[in-house]
């Protein structure tokens, strides 16, 4: 779990509100659920079918609850507590786990750093690229970015994406010399 503090108040749309406040985001950075992206047609302009599978596993639901409850506890400690007039979202009326999960389902979102849409692995029925980043079943095409990560790293993906780019460049050069 990563806790992010913002020195402004946001609503469910994450847009700043025209009054003073702060926002605490509880970000589950290693979810268990796996989504997918599928091609829907032969044309490049055909929109993809995207299934996020947010909160599909019990572990993810428990992590969301723990993060939200932890953010609430933080807001009740000094010096935060003296700044809080009221909780805007999910709001003090959301008390039970079911109510809190409903808030998470309705308002949870993916923040940046999507990975795994072209997952790397040896099984072409389950993975897009092989361990040398070549697209299974196609000659001359590689994917060299964060989309090849089989699972997301525990934090910002920038360093891992740079490493993938460096390693991918090395592989391309090695294969060109062979």
What are the roles of these predicted feature ranges?
Residues 1-160, 168-178:
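FAD-dependent oxidoreductase catalytic-site/capping-region signature
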